[in-house]
Amino acid sequence: MSPQTETKASAGFKAGVKDYKLTYYTPDYETKDTDILAAFRVTPQPGVPPEEAGAAVAAESSTGTWTTVWTDGLTSLDRYKGRCYHIESVVGEEDQFIAYVAYPLDLFEEGSVTNMFTSIVGNVFGFKALRALRLEDLRIPPAYSKTFQGPPHGIQVERDKLNKYGRPLLGCTIKPKLGLSAKNYGRAVYECLRGGLDFTKDDENVNSQPFMRWRDRFLFCAEAIYKAQAETGEIKGHYLNATAGTCEEMIKRAVFARELGVPIVMHDYLAGGFTANTSLAFYCRDNGLLLHIHRAMHAVIDRQKNHGMHFRVLAKALRMSGGDHIHAGTVVGKLEGEREMTLGFVDLLRDDFIEKDRSRGIFFTQDWVSMPGVLPVASGGIHVWHMPALTEIFGDDSVLQFGGGTLGHPWGNAPGAVANRVALEACVQARNEGRDLAREGNEIIREACKWSPELAAAC
């Protein structure tokens, strides 16, 4: 062996599996204001110490690989590596830990959720040293969030566009979700809008199938919107689903919606992908379209408690990528959603500044600086008896979306919409008069039933 080879070997370039904690576990590290911070729920394999597991997460989601490579000497690992800077046990779980990891800002491309997730929730989730791994929360520093456009318009601009203030907005998903012709679909939209709803919605499954091509649906829905607006004197909208198999086709559908003069389009942001979603958000801001976001596929990612990613992370990513509405659970309907946790990520969607609050699952203080907020959409198995609770829980800056709760009315779509609007107006008025919606909600609805036969029939 030559002296030169011996020197290289002694300098630390010997092949072999290495301990990650020697390089990537840094409990003395003081986080920087520009760091992206992550909280991972780590379940190590038996025999793997938590410090090694946390360091492995930091390494494999940043600069690390399983062995020392000679090109490590060509860059500054201290500048670019992720660092596991704190580990704590999960209460009630012997084998689970929260590992806090700090990432230098230079690891990520500006304005790209796709690039951020490729590192932070990439191959590390298949790492053999871990039985399970879940990303619980992210802290996005202003230095990074300012590289994103964010929502096309935001809450205040949407209210100004619609000229609707002081109450939640009302919506309805048209059912059956699949099988209607475009003309019958448009008729259902018209009946709901003329009855008092602000919005109707394409189901996320509706794209451009043989029974109803997208262009036909857009035309009949636009006709329904204009007719309902003329009759009610209110601005109406229908979430026209622009989701498509290619970005080019998606933008083509959004262009047609703009040409029809409708106010809003829709996108399935997880199924469609963050790159497509960000492209559509840019188009919507440039062309005055609101953007409704559906979260189809989220439960594949966020439902398991020890593996995947919490929805609060997906919600933060959506605010960065761009959307004016996003479905956020109901707390009271058919779909899963714990109240305090749900309100935690609802605040992350709407507010400018959110303090750390572990009781609500918020691991980091988040400052969105000037990024517009996103309206949370409550939908899934809700009806008029839920209206007091929904009004109290979600407040004015929300969209309450009743599918079966509107279309299932015994008298039809329009009376179902009337029932929802009357229930909402009654709850808002009662709240403004100082009544307790949580305690008096049922009584408020019963009182409103006396002067609204449509609401009485719905109850």
From Swiss-Prot:
Pfam families: RuBisCO_large (PF00016), RuBisCO_large_N (PF02788). Its cofactor is Mg(2+). The disulfide bond which can form in the large chain dimeric partners within the hexadecamer appears to be associated with oxidative stress and protein turnover. Substrate binds at residues 123, 173, 177, 295, 327, 379. It is an enzyme of class 4 (lyase). Keywords: Acetylation, Calvin cycle, Carbon dioxide fixation, Chloroplast, Disulfide bond, Lyase, Magnesium, Metal-binding, Methylation, Monooxygenase, Oxidoreductase, Photorespiration, Photosynthesis, Plastid. It is found in: Plastid, Chloroplast. The active site is at residues 175, 294. The modification N6,N6,N6-trimethyllysine is found at residue 14. The keyword Repeat does not apply. The modification N6-carboxylysine is found at residue 201. The record marks 334 as: Transition state stabilizer. Its EC number is 4.1.1.39. Belongs to the RuBisCO large chain family. Type I subfamily. PANTHER family: RIBULOSE BISPHOSPHATE CARBOXYLASE, RIBULOSE BISPHOSPHATE CARBOXYLASE LARGE CHAIN. NCBIfam families: PRK04208.1. The basic functional RuBisCO is composed of a large chain homodimer in a 'head-to-tail' conformation. In form I RuBisCO this homodimer is arranged in a barrel-like tetramer with the small subunits forming a tetrameric 'cap' on each end of the 'barrel'. This is Ribulose bisphosphate carboxylase large chain. It comes from Streptopus lanceolatus (Rose twisted stalk). The lineage of its organism: Eukaryota, Viridiplantae, Streptophyta, Embryophyta, Tracheophyta.
